[in-house]
């Protein structure tokens, strides 16, 4: 029997997309397709395990059921893909799918509670009238029916999870700017994970985890898998994608919370923020009104306007300064630092370049981060790496308990440090390796990296703009004016000769 490979899964997913194209926007139908893939995977795994136990216990169903109750997840018959496929022509198939999803949640409430709450396979808004809806859902079930996702038929344990992430990436690309809200390009995630280097027994946290790709990259740096994964995501649909993504990669014990990380952080133990050895994030760039969740407790000024203050945050994250309402970059940075382990905390965050040089409250915060010896490196990335925005970004690396006071600056934005793509630029493996090696070596490299002392940064008034430290200026070749004039004279002589010839030809023609 032919093994199922990643291309097989991707082809089925693309066929499923065809069932929706022209009817629903991809930002919506991605949730239906990825949810159905999840159901098919759970069903096939459950079916194979049941078959194995039935054979092992000679058909003793009591022992089979006892063994099944100890599996990763539970499914009843009416929740399985096979049941749904058998009822694909039912006039109420949309409702049957909804009921199946509800049962899966109920039977696995510890791991999958609310994961399908934003999905409605009976939606008239998305699917139209019953006849159209039933035809679309029938096609969707038929698309997935030929896909065998039993573990014994998958070439490796990572195939299903990798295919799921591939489709998330494709949907993110199609969604443009919106795609950047739930997916970080794989190469950027790989770079961030390589910079923080997760170790066994680390607790890893992403406060704006999107669909979970960055967390998974950090997780995979530890072959034994002996790490604890935590994340929080504001968008309910994206939170569901992340929860399923973790499950498909075998990270069943990941704790992924849903809610506003800034105004309602869930990483709380005994009324204090939890601490993590590794914190990574690609938060929304320059988030406007980031403080809106705090303002209900704020007092209005004489003009009736409410303003954020450090006292409104019970976790004291903004004691070093309150970022401007219109730019939430440092709000996320301060939250991450407040969640970082004091002994061995490592942190890498993707941010717009404005955080390096903007003034006012951001300048004061930046100064304190350097003075407190928390900033370890500033890495400039090429432009156009991210979905929906061409602006260049940087990675700030922070460490607790640093023994030196210098800061490494790397400018990896220039030509030769990336591959130019049709719609997006791409970091190649060699580009990532060069950045990581340079970060670990902490040495000066002409037009690429520079180790700046604290005094140098202080002299620059704590402005961290990379060109102040890494000189990438290419001197233009000196122009030999005499040679240029000689070339002009030669060209003019040749032109005069050609013009004379042309006049002769015209005269011969009587023109």
Where do the protein language model's features map onto the residues?
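Non-catalytic, mostly N-terminal accessory regions of nucleic-acid modification and defense proteins
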Residues: 1-196, 200, 255-266, 270, ...
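Alpha-helix N-cap/helix-initiation motif
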Residues: 2, 135-139, 178-181, 227, ...
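A conserved structural/catalytic subdomain of Rossmann-like adenosyl-cofactor enzymes
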Residues: 2-4, 273-511
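Soluble or luminal CAZymes and related metallo-dependent hydrolases
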Residues: 8, 234, 328
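Active-site catalytic pocket residues across diverse enzymes, especially alpha/beta-hydrolases
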Residues: 46, 222, 340
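Gly-rich Lys/Arg/Thr-decorated short loops/hinges at beta-loop-alpha junctions or inter-strand turns
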Residues: 170-173, 225, 311-318
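Conserved S-adenosyl-L-methionine
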Residues: 178-281, 285-297, 301-302, 351-354, ...
